[in-house]
Amino acid sequence: MAVLTHGSPTPSGAHFDGKGINFTLFSAHAEQVTLCLFDEQGQERQIAMPARTGDIWHGYLPGGKPGQRYGYRVSGPFEPSRGHRFNPHKLLIDPRTRALEGKVGDDPRFTGGVSQPDVRDSAAALPKCLVIHEEYDWQGDKPPAIPWGNTVIYEAHVRGLTQLHPDIPPELRGTYAALAHPALIEHLKTLGITTLELLPVQFHIDEPRLQKMGLSNYWGYNVLAPFAVDPDYASGREGISPLRELRDAVKALHNAGIEVILDVVFNHSAELDVFGPTLCQRGIDNASYYWLTPDGEYDNITGCGNALRLSHPYVTQWVIDCLNYWRDSCHVDGFRFDLGTVLGRTPAFDQHAPLFAALAADERLSACKLIAEPWDIGLGGYQLGNFPTGFSEWNDQYRDAMRGFWLRGEVPRGTFAQHFAASSRLFEQRGRLPSASINQITAHDGFTLLDLLCFNQKHNQMNGEENRDGSDNNHSNNFGCEGLVADAAIWQRRKACQRALLTTLLLSQGTPMLLAGDEQGHSQQGNNNAYCQNNILTWLDWGSADRALMTFTADLIRLRQQIPALTQDQWWQSGDSNVQWLDSQGQALSDAAWEQGCQQQLQILLSQRWLVLINATDHECEMHLPEGEWEGIPPFGVSDHAERLTTWRGSAHTICVLIKRD
């Protein structure tokens, strides 16, 4: 018969010390916490936690070993109007578990209990927490420590990036192991990618609504266990755990000089709204973990049914501990925070919020690359430019300005230039560096680059929501024909804009983020919200990749790394050597010229040597070049002999870079 001794309130979670397992669980409002141990046959033993220190319940299991399955039952008041939803009939997952065994199905035993406790026991249906204790030989692994000024981010999904790669063994495709495969690493190195940003690899589940439709949460933002590696992306090879496989991938990428950033989800949990499943925090301490309205309802500022209360001292520490676990255990180099405004809610957004202060005070985490998606859907949720020093931010204003300039002819060149210069009005006056602007034309959420040029309307019918989901504000242009089938003239204009947008992204000041597949011409058939499409719609089709576009993109990244104005991560100042803004005649743009409607032509001289020529009009133009001898540079052509170019004739929707001869 298992007996728990008092144990210790630290360390948090379930930890094997060589002689037994120490268990801890936070709950400020519980009246009793019961540890539930399960054997291999699923038989349950319930043991009351024998000690409480402050709000930490704890106990020690002598002789306990790694592999022990467990969960919790928590007793206390069921008073929804006060935010309390305790129910000992529901087995609960440890919010700090580092592994889970099993999946969460659409089981009615998880739901119910909206106005009164549901008495159906959920233990048989719930995945069990696993105590793990895995040693790992990092073999001297060190972080690549890429300076922000040299950083080029590649946003990718583990499965989508590798599932159809012909040079990766079939049994490894779609897995963490595929990320470590030489063929994938060679692609990243050839492109010039410095930093791989992975969509969530934390343990996530599929919403009941999707399960009923036979779909799944492909993107993975419905996180249940943020400390646990998602086993869905593991190869299942004997003797190799999901954690080890991810570690192997990070080590291989580091050996190639490539950083790894994880997209993490701390804005909401997989328990959804009041009608959602009771799996974890709702039953452990609902009032502490979630933002609630005065009458106890969930304050749905995320659009996902609930919002985590990250200003609570314990919840703040839970996030910090989780980030440090991923950093220490998996050697990741940074984090991208989904719906990042929630991180600073107190409940209003505050640059000095507890979580921001804790991140700044943590030497290890403050040295990581930290990236915020600077919005949520709550009051005051749009916070682009307002995150504290140490954060970079996804810049949707850059995205919309560049799309509008090239595809809609509705953005004046002054606005274009301001965002080309790392959206300086947003970041410079707030003491941030240019790298704080994460520039993007596309991301996982929205059209791919090719679809941006082929579809004026979203086509999300496969998502099962009658095309209601996804944004209608895409700033796209199909050039007169909806879809991928079009005549040669339309495709010529599309391809010109495709290259112009890639060039703009990769030669703008700030930190560029390239969506995986955009360099290949990947299409999602007009679906701009493919969160539930775990199929060939989202998987990159390496067999039909546009090789010429891949070469073009690689040449652009190499060019970027040669231009000091783009890599030194310092603001451009009027009159310095970093930048000169010129008109189509090669003359400095006057203040009046900046304000002349939607002028779509300009020249940008970077570091006194690289001349970016821009014709975003729908007709050919001729530009007079500044004084000097100019020649083409890859990927824009190379002169076979010395030639003094005085003019440049540019086709519609084109951009070109020339280099000044010494």
UniProtKB/Swiss-Prot annotation:
The first-level EC class reads hydrolase
Catalysis performed (reactions): Hydrolysis of (1->6)-alpha-D-glucosidic linkages to branches with degrees of polymerization of three or four glucose residues in limit dextrin
Tell me the Gene3D superfamilies matching this sequence: Glycosidases (3.20.20.80), Golgi alpha-mannosidase II (2.60.40.1180), Immunoglobulins (2.60.40.10)
What GO biological process terms does the UniProt entry carry, in alphabetical order?
glycogen catabolic process
Site (Transition state stabilizer): give the residues: D445
Q: Which SMART domains match?
A: Aamy
* SUPFAM superfamilies listed in its UniProt record: (Trans)glycosidases, E set domains, Glycosyl hydrolase domain
Q: Name one Pfam family in it.
A: CBM_48
Biological or metabolic pathway of the protein:
Glycan degradation; glycogen degradation
UniProt-listed Enzyme Commission number(s) = 3.2.1.196
The UniProt entry annotates the active site at D338, E373
For this protein, what is any one GO molecular function term?
hydrolase activity, hydrolyzing O-glycosyl compounds
User: What are the alphabetically sorted keywords of the record?
Assistant: Carbohydrate metabolism, Glycogen metabolism, Glycosidase, Hydrolase
Q: What does this protein do?
A: Removes maltotriose and maltotetraose chains that are attached by 1,6-alpha-linkage to the limit dextrin main chain, generating a debranched limit dextrin.
Q: So what family is this one in?
A: Belongs to the glycosyl hydrolase 13 family.
- Name under which the protein is recorded: Glycogen debranching enzyme
